[in-house]
Amino acid sequence: MDGEEVAALVIDNGSGMCKAGFAGDDAPRAVFPSLVGRPRHQGIMVGMGQKDSYVGDEAQSKRGILTLRYPIEHGIVSNWDDMEKIWHHTFYNELRVAPEEHPVLLTEAPMNPKSNREKMTQIMFETFNVPAFYVSIQAVLSLYSSGRTTGIVLDSGDGVTHVVPIYAGFSLPHGILRIDLAGRDLTNHLSKILSERGYSFTTSAEREIVRDIKERLCYVALDFEQEMQTSSQSSAIEKSYELPDGQVITIGNERFRAPEALFRPADLGLEAAGIDQTTFNSIMKCDMDVRKELYGNIVMSGGTTMFPGIAERMQKEITALAPSSMKVKIIAPPERKYSVWIGGSILASLSTFQQMWISKQEYDESGPSIVHHKCF
């Protein structure tokens, strides 16, 4: 190791996808589903090398015979044994590195419980023996990746949506708002409205088909009522989708009805404000002096902000809520699916960041609670 720079590893553990790679790269090397699958039936064919669990793409491809579980729910780790399997898979199978040789930067959801950060830190140092470790808030990293230090980030992934106002590189905790409504809920919502058409998707494997339909065909309407009217009069928006068994299904107004729930959570039976209203509420919780800069730097991040039409709709809704003379600007970078990871890659390769790592030695002296003093 003498004098040679060792690349840090950056791992963004999302509720739906895990993004991993090396600091300094401009995109993650490995992107795979954050899921662990276990066989539903006893293996009977000897010599097939059946495993008791599968992770990521392998679990995805064998989903027909597995029960799939996501260890991260609503952005927060709920099953540590499965989480450890995912990290093990990330290091050894995806990146093919020895974790004891590389500093590791992990990401976490805003307002992550303290005990979770400690557990993360403990597993990294004790199970994987990493030499150095750091944990960073996802939304802050997204803002870095857009080249800003001030702005408000709407980060919506598979498990949770957050609105995080950030000023001069620090998140403003009193303004952080969270909505437990994200990609996974939209997938469930879509499968519910598809069942009204007589298409039923019930197993955890079939749920993945609905996710694919959502990612390929859904979009956000600029004016929902208008779009509903148009779609009832013409079949212009109808699209067909071929299922794995060759059956072709047709989907129409479901294309924009599913993502509409982001703006109207009541559609899902949730008593929450939509992403537009929540962004506005978050700005209003911040000091008057910073609001103008927040309105002018609304940054979208995460896979659930990838729907066509979402930025235009957001611009329209926020402009209607904001003071009339206010300049509202929505920034929706094309790579926003990975912007958290990209921000982590930037951060971990800064020369000024190198003294920020928690070292193995510091961990051995202070224990897991050191994470609260060094990472904020």
Swiss-Prot record:
The name this protein goes by in its record: Actin
Q: List the disulfide bonds.
A: none
Keyword Transmembrane on entry:
no
- Taxonomic path: Eukaryota, Fungi, Dikarya, Ascomycota, Saccharomycotina
Keywords for the protein's UniProt record, in alphabetical order: ATP-binding, Cytoplasm, Cytoskeleton, Hydrolase, Nucleotide-binding
Reactions mediated catalytically: ATP + H2O = ADP + phosphate + H(+)
Q: Which Pfam families match?
A: Actin (PF00022)
Domain of life, source organism: Eukaryota
- Coarse class of the primary localization is cytoplasm
Question: Can you say where in the cell this protein is located?
Answer: Cytoplasm, Cytoskeleton
Q: Which gene encodes it?
A: ACT1
What family, per the record? Belongs to the actin family.
* Record keyword Nucleotide-binding present: yes
**Any one Gene Ontology molecular-function term assigned to this protein's record:** hydrolase activity
- Read off the PROSITE patterns from this record: ACTINS_1 (PS00406), ACTINS_2 (PS00432), ACTINS_ACT_LIKE (PS01132)
Where does the chain cross the membrane? none
GO cellular component annotations of the record = cytoplasm; cytoskeleton
Function description: Actins are highly conserved proteins that are involved in various types of cell motility and are ubiquitously expressed in all eukaryotic cells.
Q: What is its EC number?
A: 3.6.4.-
